[in-house]
């Protein structure tokens, strides 16, 4: 029951993932981080079986670091997405990973952020917005209506609010906590989005 979605703004990209780890109808933990920082300016959000996500994510992270040490430079976001897609394709008919990915990054040379959508069948596409799991099911229509090029951070925060509210409206047992991660020229930044705390704060504000 993963909720993962993301989009690009004005020289930054946002990736949101829920924090719940579930097995059938049991919640094992509510502080799971479903994103992995590949380097200082790239992150990858994954949905699928946890074993596949952890193993594949750490494999990509380690090999990108090895490339950096050997060659003295980091992969661009496009190159990182191509490498990740190639690894999914090579393993598809040998030992496939059931991993769906959103890969976001910022490239200083181009002075822009980008987002790549990949699925477990090794398709890869550069997108302005996308999602996996219930994030993909319920948020794409909101992206069609509210996403716009060069979004400001205030507009991006408002769009994140809309997407999470839609997920909570549609799902009977919707996650209450999300990691909101932004990647820009200064690196990656993480914020915990707690729906219960936000509702309590809204009630306090209305009471005043």
Regions found by a protein language model. Give the residues of each.
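Long, low-complexity N-terminal extensions
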Residues: 1-208
